[in-house]
Amino acid sequence: MDSRASGTASNGETKPVYPVMEKEEEEGTLERGHWNNKMEFVLSVAGEIIGLGNVWRFPYLCYKNGGGAFFIPYLVFLFTCGVPVFLLETALGQYTSQGGVTAWRKICPIFEGIGYASQMIVILLNVYYIIVLAWALFYLFSSFTIDLPWGGCHHEWNTEHCVEFQKTNGSLNGTSENATSPVIEFWERRVLKISDGIQHLGALRWELALCLLLAWVICYFCIWKGVKSTGKVVYFTATFPYLMLVVLLIRGVTLPGAAQGIQFYLYPNLTRLWDPQVWMDAGTQIFFSFAICLGCLTALGSYNKYHNNCYRDCLALCFLNSGTSFVAGFAIFSILGFMSQEQGVPISEVAESGPGLAFIAYPRAVVMLPFSPLWACCFFFMVVLLGLDSQFVCVESLVTALVDMYPRVFRKKNRREVLILGVSVVSFLVGLVMLTEGGMYVFQLFDYYAASGMCLLFVAIFESLCVAWVYGARRFYDNIEDMIGYRPWPLIKYCWLFLTPAVCTATFLFSLIKYTPLTYNKKYTYPWWGDALGWLLALSSMVCIPAWSLYRLGTLKGPFREPPPRSLQRIRQLMCPAEDLPQRNPAGPSAPATPRTSLLRLTELESHC
């Protein structure tokens, strides 16, 4: 295990000292590894946080919640929750050199459940997020043709209700009240072959299963050698989507009607700020798009060198992420404005979010463009890459957590590769359920409950409370100062102490109050047991935090049978950081290393150890 203490180098600079790992070396334990350079870390994090949510969720939320006015609550959550928690998790990983579970064990054992909660979310996320890649691959392969298969009603999967929009007047080639478009029929009858409910799963869609298998094979080989392979792959997977986004942006803004679409995207409606739902949407979008509370940032940060300037990296990555979301809105809504003008319908009828944008709205727009197969290939290749690096970083997060929990088992030759293979195979097999004819209903359950904003908010509350109030915000600032050479902006510390837990708690409670049962396509209502299954998925992660704390308290040997002073002292031991964490030398670089307790202020000594 990569344990570190501090010492003084010959040039007077305080450096972490790595103790000799005699037992592990005797047993042939491999080194944990580091990024070869800063760029690998930056691109890996960028690939993780800049994903599908930037393209198919943020622009729609802007349009839905008051256009430019939505940026007000978005920026509030960005600076009170997004940036502080982003820095907290990244710095925690860099400071402890541990994954998403053991990092929390080292700074506060009683809150180790935070790590288990985040990994439970990642386990569920790994199963269903990659399904989107399977769909995107299916569309990508279907785009290698002269005429796109969702462009007309003459295919075997089309029904008599299939009608096409006239490009000029928006009228339908028919008068049926049940009329559907070829894009929707391709999605529901060719790709999904969707059944009438979750109770009828039906047959497995073998074509999608092969696409899912291909996605998992690509994901496996992207991370099978750890940071050595991941650091190289992200040079392509994290940068090429930007090229595609720029190409689509240039094409979009040059289309007729683009200005109208961009106006709908940005025109501010300040009255929407009085709606609490707007603020909840802004908060959940921050947590979705910044990949916080998943353990991914902790895992990626743990491969940094000790003196890497994680504070500067975090600020740059946060603003890059938000900027990408903003620019993606221009690319998407310029296309939607073009659709609105060509079909002669309001933009509200073509604006969609989530899979509806990627697999219905945008494919419909592509059909109207010259050289439509080319633009379809560009778009779906971008979707695949946006989802791919987010997926394999999540798998890397889980694998890193397991390896750090059991280093003597997995940190040996070929053991890590076998572990990744096992995770991939199990996740693939479970994911096949979502590729049945009723699999879309299962997918929505996972998406709505398993990795919902509610779960992420719950974890964020305890993360900020643990670091700020139990471990000590000032002490964590001391740790960051020891790593980067200066103290971050003081506002971030006060966010950890007050703003982040308060804002997250308020948003969490509001999401409970405003909870509405899940529906599909605003028509199908899930049975009671479907909602119950969804809540079990949500609680599977949230329950880890209190359950672990109660377990640790319950396994203390006799604390409640001893006098109160001694029992409290034993409980405080569960709140004490590990002794082998890097130690800051407060006396100056020329002074000898000091015990860890000399770093604590009086109040921290009394409340911790």
Curated annotation (Swiss-Prot):
<feature type="transmembrane region" description="Helical; Name=11">
    <location>
        <begin position="490"/>
        <end position="510"/>
    </location>
</feature>
<dbReference type="GO" id="GO:0016323">
    <property type="term" value="C:basolateral plasma membrane"/>
</dbReference>
<feature type="transmembrane region" description="Helical; Name=3">
    <location>
        <begin position="121"/>
        <end position="141"/>
    </location>
</feature>
<feature type="modified residue" description="Phosphoserine">
    <location>
        <position position="598"/>
    </location>
</feature>
<dbReference type="GO" id="GO:0042995">
    <property type="term" value="C:cell projection"/>
</dbReference>
<feature type="transmembrane region" description="Helical; Name=1">
    <location>
        <begin position="41"/>
        <end position="61"/>
    </location>
</feature>
<dbReference type="Pfam" id="PF00209">
    <property type="entry name" value="SNF"/>
</dbReference>
<keyword id="KW-1003">Cell membrane</keyword>
<dbReference type="InterPro" id="IPR002981">
    <property type="entry name" value="Na/ntran_symport_GABA_GAT2"/>
</dbReference>
<feature type="transmembrane region" description="Helical; Name=9">
    <location>
        <begin position="418"/>
        <end position="438"/>
    </location>
</feature>
<protein>
    <recommendedName>
        <fullName>Sodium- and chloride-dependent GABA transporter 2</fullName>
    </recommendedName>
</protein>
<dbReference type="InterPro" id="IPR037272">
    <property type="entry name" value="SNS_sf"/>
</dbReference>
<feature type="transmembrane region" description="Helical; Name=7">
    <location>
        <begin position="319"/>
        <end position="339"/>
    </location>
</feature>
<keyword id="KW-1015">Disulfide bond</keyword>
<keyword id="KW-0325">Glycoprotein</keyword>
<feature type="transmembrane region" description="Helical; Name=10">
    <location>
        <begin position="453"/>
        <end position="473"/>
    </location>
</feature>
<feature type="glycosylation site" description="N-linked (GlcNAc...) asparagine">
    <location>
        <position position="269"/>
    </location>
</feature>
<feature type="glycosylation site" description="N-linked (GlcNAc...) asparagine">
    <location>
        <position position="169"/>
    </location>
</feature>
<feature type="compositionally biased region" description="Polar residues">
    <location>
        <begin position="1"/>
        <end position="13"/>
    </location>
</feature>
<keyword id="KW-0472">Membrane</keyword>
<comment type="similarity">
    <text>Belongs to the sodium:neurotransmitter symporter (SNF) (TC 2.A.22) family. SLC6A13 subfamily.</text>
</comment>
<feature type="topological domain" description="Cytoplasmic">
    <location>
        <begin position="1"/>
        <end position="40"/>
    </location>
</feature>
<keyword id="KW-0597">Phosphoprotein</keyword>
<feature type="transmembrane region" description="Helical; Name=12">
    <location>
        <begin position="528"/>
        <end position="548"/>
    </location>
</feature>
<feature type="topological domain" description="Extracellular">
    <location>
        <begin position="142"/>
        <end position="206"/>
    </location>
</feature>
<dbReference type="GO" id="GO:0006836">
    <property type="term" value="P:neurotransmitter transport"/>
</dbReference>
<dbReference type="GO" id="GO:0005332">
    <property type="term" value="F:gamma-aminobutyric acid:sodium:chloride symporter activity"/>
</dbReference>
<feature type="transmembrane region" description="Helical; Name=4">
    <location>
        <begin position="207"/>
        <end position="227"/>
    </location>
</feature>
<keyword id="KW-0812">Transmembrane</keyword>
<comment type="function">
    <text>Mediates sodium- and chloride-dependent transport of gamma-aminobutyric acid (GABA). Can also mediate transport of beta-alanine, taurine and hypotaurine.</text>
</comment>
<feature type="modified residue" description="Phosphothreonine">
    <location>
        <position position="594"/>
    </location>
</feature>
<feature type="glycosylation site" description="N-linked (GlcNAc...) asparagine">
    <location>
        <position position="173"/>
    </location>
</feature>
<feature type="disulfide bond">
    <location>
        <begin position="153"/>
        <end position="162"/>
    </location>
</feature>
<dbReference type="InterPro" id="IPR000175">
    <property type="entry name" value="Na/ntran_symport"/>
</dbReference>
<keyword id="KW-1133">Transmembrane helix</keyword>
<feature type="transmembrane region" description="Helical; Name=8">
    <location>
        <begin position="366"/>
        <end position="386"/>
    </location>
</feature>
<feature type="transmembrane region" description="Helical; Name=5">
    <location>
        <begin position="233"/>
        <end position="253"/>
    </location>
</feature>
<dbReference type="GO" id="GO:0089718">
    <property type="term" value="P:amino acid import across plasma membrane"/>
</dbReference>
<feature type="topological domain" description="Cytoplasmic">
    <location>
        <begin position="549"/>
        <end position="609"/>
    </location>
</feature>
<feature type="region of interest" description="Disordered">
    <location>
        <begin position="1"/>
        <end position="23"/>
    </location>
</feature>
<keyword id="KW-0532">Neurotransmitter transport</keyword>
<keyword id="KW-0769">Symport</keyword>
